[in-house]
Amino acid sequence: MATSTNGIIDPPIDDLLSKVESKYALVIFASKRARQINDYYADLHEGSLFDNVGPLVDSSVDDKPLSVAMHEINEDRLVLKPIAAAE
């Protein structure tokens, strides 16, 4: 059975900030992933399973997509790789 997440207080923000360069990068990274998770659940209702990737950590449908994204980042299921600068 999936364990329930504790929202934004778990994982701690300090742990999350060690995974990215800045708070801004964390917000953008987590929000983009949360949108993908939200789209995945919307696709489930439409019967399409192959357009988006679902949660990579144990979660339930009741968990907020942003909380799930934060847990994925904290558990190193997602890694932010910077794009190489144009020369």
UniProtKB/Swiss-Prot annotation:
E.C. number: 2.7.7.6
Known catalytic reactions: RNA(n) + a ribonucleoside 5'-triphosphate = RNA(n+1) + diphosphate
Gene3D superfamilies in the record: 3.90.940.10
Molecular-function GO terms, alphabetical: DNA binding; DNA-directed RNA polymerase activity
Keyword Nucleotidyltransferase: yes
Keyword DNA damage: no
Gene Ontology process terms (BP): DNA-templated transcription
One Gene Ontology cellular component annotation held by this UniProt entry: DNA-directed RNA polymerase complex
Domain of life: Bacteria
Top-rank EC class of the record's enzyme: transferase
Stored InterPro entries: DNA-dir_RNA_pol_omega (IPR003716), Pol_omega/Rpo6/RPB6 (IPR006110), RPB6/omega-like_sf (IPR036161)
Pfam families per record: RNA_pol_Rpb6
Keywords, sorted A to Z: DNA-directed RNA polymerase, Nucleotidyltransferase, Transcription, Transferase
UniProt similarity note: Belongs to the RNA polymerase subunit omega family.
Purpose: Promotes RNA polymerase assembly. Latches the N- and C-terminal regions of the beta' subunit thereby facilitating its interaction with the beta and alpha subunits.
Subunit structure: The RNAP catalytic core consists of 2 alpha, 1 beta, 1 beta' and 1 omega subunit. When a sigma factor is associated with the core the holoenzyme is formed, which can initiate transcription.
Name of the protein described by the UniProt record: DNA-directed RNA polymerase subunit omega
Provenance organism: Leifsonia xyli subsp. xyli (strain CTCB07)
